């Protein structure tokens, strides 16, 4: 962390999450007297409103992903680390990740949301969520596989149930 920043006496801010909130915050912190590290498990920002287009093969994954290093590279006081957060030590003010530990004076957790299945194990194991590019690609693959399975059925007797899909959006 020290090699990117000239003045190591500046307060350290660690931001967990490179989504909309995390990126908006780094824009605001640009050129302010802080050393900022953005940590995300992906090296790209996903434009989530278009994930359904990836799942339905309307767009490619690259068209809704923006490299975080490209965005952050122009900000002299901000660095990016590709890592997953494994723990936060509030006493020692450290974020423990798969890429090491990061000390902070201020910690911002902007890691996004997870799907709440409300304890329904059937929903959790038999549905697809749509919060990331890998999940959208998994959904696309499952849909295409169902079409392939239906085509393989005996001629004139397609398994129509294999072609039923339900998309729920709240």
Task: Give residue ranges: language-model regions.
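Beta1-alpha1 glycine-rich phosphate/pyrophosphate-binding loop at the start
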Residues: 2-78, 160-169
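FAD-binding core/adjacent interface of flavoenzyme oxidoreductases
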Residues: 1-10, 78-166
């Amino acid at each position: 962390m020290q090699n990117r920043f000239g003045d190591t006496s500046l307060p350290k801010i660690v931001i967990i999450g490179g989504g909309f909130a995390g990126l908006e915050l780094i824009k605001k912190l640009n050129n302010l007297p802080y050393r900022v590290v953005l940590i995300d498990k992906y090296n790209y920002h996903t434009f989530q409103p278009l994930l359904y287009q990836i799942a339905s093969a309307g767009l490619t994954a690259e068209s809704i992903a923006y490299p975080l290093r490209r965005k952050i590279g122009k900000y002299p006081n901000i660095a990016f680390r590709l890592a997953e957060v494994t723990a936060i030590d509030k006493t020692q003010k450290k974020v423990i990740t798969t890429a090491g530990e990061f000390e902070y004076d201020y910690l911002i957790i902007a890691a996004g949301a997870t799907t709440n299945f409300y304890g329904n194990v059937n929903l959790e194991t038999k549905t697809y969520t749509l919060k990331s590019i890998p999940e959208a690609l998994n959904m696309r693959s499952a849909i295409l596989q169902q079409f392939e399975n239906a085509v393989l059925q005996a001629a004139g007797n397609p398994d129509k149930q294999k072609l039923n899909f339900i998309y729920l959006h709240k």
